[in-house]
Design a protein with these regions (language model features):
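Conserved MFS/SLC helix-loop-helix module at the cytosolic interface between two early adjacent transmembrane helices
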Residues: 66-104
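Glycine-rich segments within core transmembrane alpha-helices of 12-TM secondary carriers
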Residues: 140-165, 365-376
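Helix-to-loop junctions at the C-terminal end of transmembrane segments
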Residues: 67-79, 278-293, 383-384
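Flexible cytoplasmic inter-helical loops of multi-pass small-molecule transporters
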Residues: 194-221, 419-433
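Cytoplasmic membrane-interface "Motif A"-like loop-to-helix N-cap segments
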Residues: 77-88, 288-304
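Cytoplasmic helix-loop-helix junction between adjacent transmembrane helices
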Residues: 110-149
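C-terminal transmembrane helical hairpin of 12-TM major facilitator-type secondary transporters
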Residues: 293-343
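Extracytoplasmic gate region of multi-pass secondary transporters
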Residues: 35-39, 154-161, 226-280, 340, ...
Length: 462
């Protein structure tokens, strides 16, 4: 069978496992989801400025970047059942308390804990499990489905939050209730994940702890020497840097056009959740058909953000009509979510074995999400330090510059991968196995899921 004809999900059990990952991956980021549509209200709830919010996001980013690197090796050494459920439960507890305080020092502490539980080992484990769910040829599709599915959940989250906010007379009590509901769901999902996710790893030395550690470290040495791994991370870095400006699209409309709070919230939901649903779901299929794969799709996305970013520079300068600004901002948001759905797909497309994908994705997460440790604060300082249109003009110009850099890196990565990266990786893996005395076929996560599902059926059948 041709690799391209393989289904995205090999069985119903694999699909159900993926749906659990989608739910966990979005509810774990409930607080971050709210900022896209309700940042002004969140600032009111916590009684903080945009700069203080930027500090909170920078703290969050610094902490999770440290843990991405420190815990990279555990991604291949331990199973998803070990890495995901407990973090979901503890993240739920932290989310509950975030809706109960206005003390900035307490908020700083809670953001540290939220980053520990909902990022650290958790997020790379989710990404790694998603990458292992399907064949290398389906990586753009599976990550597009992940991002689109998360968008559906985010739409539900933000719609509920806005509904509570409006129903309770535009009171921050609605936000507090939303924090409580999301916290409860996170705890429940943590319990469900414990029973659903597979308990085995994909290592060939899974039953020997010492040899398993050697295999993981050898795999990390092999994969992290590949220039393509770092290039793909740099492309994702540019995507995420641009993404961090999105919360300030809402404040731009609020400050420049003084639109009603409800109208701005609706725009925020449409541009974030709507963008993820409308664009992310088909992104892998679009990238494969129109751009020759995920890397080509990333280049196309940067070309669009470059054009629209420059357009927003002009619109901010002349203070154009609000509807025109909203159309351009919506276009940038859609391009960002198109790229976000693709920026981890190259790690599967370049032929990295599933058993070594976790640690690579953890290091990639460090690179990709590095802007979260400084970019939110940087944008806030630019906007607070340059009130009015001047600050936003600088922000949109910076988005254009980042798009140029990202486009260049994506084109470079595509050229290298076209020169035979997958073949070179396969040869190096054969040499690694020979050096360690490892034998046997490569394990697949989908096979482990099906085996566990069949075992459960036998145990519970009459």
């Amino acid at each position: 069978m041709n690799n391209n004809s393989q289904p995205v999900f090999s069985s119903r059990a694999v699909l159900m496992n993926f749906l659990v990952l989608v739910l966990c991956s979005q509810f774990a980021f409930a607080v971050l989801a709210m900022k896209g549509a309700l940042l002004p209200q969140m600032l009111e709830l916590w009684n903080i400025s945009k700069t203080q919010f930027g500090m909170l996001m920078s703290i969050y980013g610094i902490v999770h970047n440290i843990f991405y690197v420190a815990l990279a090796w555990v991604q291949d050494r331990f199973s998803a059942r070990v890495l995901i459920p407990v973090n979901m439960v503890m993240g739920g507890v932290t989310t509950f308390f975030l809706g109960q305080t206005t003390d900035f020092a307490t908020l700083c502490f809670l953001f540290v804990m939220l980053s520990l539980w909902c990022e650290g080992a958790f997020w790379p484990a989710v990404l790694s499990a998603v990458r292992k769910t399907t064949a290398d040829s389906n990586q753009g599709k599976i990550f597009g489905l992940l991002e689109g599915g998360r968008g559906c959940v985010e739409l539900l989250q933000n719609s509920l939050t806005v509904a509570l906010y409006v129903y309770l007379g535009y009171s921050i009590l609605g936000l507090q209730l939303a924090f409580m509901v999301n916290a409860l769901v996170m705890v429940i999902l943590g319990v469900v994940a414990w029973f659903m996710l597979p308990s085995q790893t994909l290592l060939k030395t899974d039953n020997d702890a010492r040899q398993a550690n050697q295999e993981v470290l050898a795999g990390m040495k092999l994969t992290l020497r590949l220039p393509e791994v770092w290039l793909a991370g740099a492309v994702g870095f540019c995507v995420y840097f641009v993404y961090t400006a999105m919360p300030y699209f809402v404040t731009y409309l609020d400050e420049m056009y003084v639109l009603p709070a409800l109208a701005i919230s609706i725009f925020g939901i449409a541009s974030t959740s709507g963008g993820r649903i409308a664009v992310a779901f088909p992104s892998g299929f679009i990238a494969g058909r129109l751009f020759g794969g995920a890397v080509g799709g990333l280049g196309g996305g940067f070309a669009l953000t470059l054009v629209l970013g420059l357009a927003m520079v002009g619109l901010a300068w002349i203070e154009a009509a609000s509807w025109l600004a909203m159309v351009c901002l919506m276009g940038i948001a859609f391009a960002i979510f198109f790229m976000r759905a693709l920026y981890f797909a190259p790690y599967g497309e370049m032929g990295l074995p599933q058993r070594f994908s976790g640690s690579v994705i953890a290091i990639a997460s460090f690179i990709v999400y590095l802007p979260s440790s400084f970019a939110y604060l940087l944008w806030a300082l630019i906007l607070d330090g340059n009130p009015g249109a001047e600050g936003y003009l600088q922000m949109f110009f910076a988005i254009s510059v980042l798009s140029i850099v990202g486009l260049f890196l994506a084109r470079t990565l595509r050229r290298r991968m076209s020169s035979g990266t997958a073949h070179r990786v396969a040869q190096q893996v054969i040499q690694l196995d020979a050096a360690l005395g490892l034998q046997g076929e490569e394990k697949k996560l989908s096979d482990l899921i099906d085996q566990a599902n069949n075992k459960n059926k036998r145990e519970f059948s009459p």
